[in-house]
């Protein structure tokens, strides 16, 4: 039997995140040499990563990080295969570390984030791959949002009490209003608007909605003379449903979100809603 101590096993577990039996086996095969055991476990872990590539990662968590002065914020989704891993401390620590890295480096997009160095000589992609190996599940990082402005608010929603947040919303206002920011963010979490305003809806989407409205109206046998007005009404209904500013406000359905903002003298600059797996 190789010559090593319980302290060596503990050290190896801390260095690699591997289980106790795997660490003992690696030390046996490495004749008690911790460095060689680390290398062997990492090679084994990378083989496991390759095997997990074809698996689906639809569970996970959304994490957030807001600056103390609330002028900047990060929202990040990290996915895994099971809710068991998602609610574990190790997985959530990885997610929070990644969010802190985004806050510190402000990557332009997901490609830039994955290619950036989170530690000396280690990219974010390599860091995620290590988490994949250590946690024994496919771990995926492919989405984040980062806002900087006059005031940034966040709302995190748990769909199950024993799981980490599955929905996160980031909002940017042109002035500080914590209560309004929270209310708007909660509304976004619940109603999932696709766009901020009419102006943000792509022209091709509007045209597609208009064509559907025309075909539906004709199929209903409506008079041709009434067609333009009916179609316009249906397109306006689409805008009301799909745009945040057009939706009835969740906390006061008699007012639109735009009306609530106008009454508060606040402009909502942008928002981001992330739901795990969607």
Curated annotation (Swiss-Prot):
The keyword Transmembrane does not apply. InterPro entries: EF-Ts_dimer_sf, Transl_elong_EFTs/EF1B, Transl_elong_EFTs/EF1B_dimer, Transl_elong_Ts_CS, UBA-like_sf. It is found in: Cytoplasm. Keywords: Cytoplasm, Elongation factor, Protein biosynthesis. SUPFAM superfamilies: Elongation factor Ts (EF-Ts), dimerisation domain, UBA-like. One of its GO terms (cellular component) is cytoplasm. GO terms for molecular function: translation elongation factor activity. Disulfide bonds: none annotated. Residues 82-85 are annotated as: Involved in Mg(2+) ion dislocation from EF-Tu. It comes from the Bacteria. HAMAP family: EF_Ts (MF_00050). Associates with the EF-Tu.GDP complex and induces the exchange of GDP to GTP. It remains bound to the aminoacyl-tRNA.EF-Tu.GTP complex up to the GTP hydrolysis stage on the ribosome. NCBIfam families: tsf. Belongs to the EF-Ts family. This is Elongation factor Ts.
């Amino acid at each position: 039997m190789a010559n090593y101590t319980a302290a060596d096993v503990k050290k190896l577990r801390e260095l690699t995140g591997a289980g106790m039996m795997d660490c003992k086996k690696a030390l046996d095969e490495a004749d008690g040499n911790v460095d060689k055991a680390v290398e062997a476990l990492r090679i084994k872990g990378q083989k496991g990563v390759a095997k997990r590539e074809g698996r689906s990662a639809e569970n996970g968590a959304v994490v957030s990080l807001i600056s103390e002065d609330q002028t900047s914020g990060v929202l990040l989704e990290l996915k895994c295969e099971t809710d068991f891993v998602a609610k574990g401390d190790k997985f959530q620590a990885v997610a929070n570390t990644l969010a802190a890295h985004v806050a510190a480096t402000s990557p332009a997009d997901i490609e830039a984030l994955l290619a950036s160095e989170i530690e000396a000589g280690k990219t974010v992609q390599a860091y995620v791959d290590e988490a994949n190996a250590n946690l024994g599940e496919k771990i995926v990082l492919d989405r984040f949002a980062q806002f900087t402005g006059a005031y940034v608010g966040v709302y995190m929603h748990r769909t199950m009490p024993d799981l980490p947040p599955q929905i996160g919303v980031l909002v940017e206002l042109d002035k500080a209003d914590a209560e309004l920011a929270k209310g708007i963010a909660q509304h976004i979490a619940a109603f999932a608007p696709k766009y901020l305003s009419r102006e943000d809806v792509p022209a091709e989407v509007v045209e597609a909605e208009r064509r559907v409205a025309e075909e539906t109206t004709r199929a209903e046998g409506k008079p041709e003379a009434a067609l333009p007005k009916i179609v316009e009404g249906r397109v306006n209904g689409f805008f009301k449903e799909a745009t945040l500013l057009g939706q009835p406000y969740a906390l006061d359905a008699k007012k639109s979100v735009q009306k609530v903002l106008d009454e508060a003298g606040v402009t909502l600059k942008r928002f981001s809603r992330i739901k795990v797996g969607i």
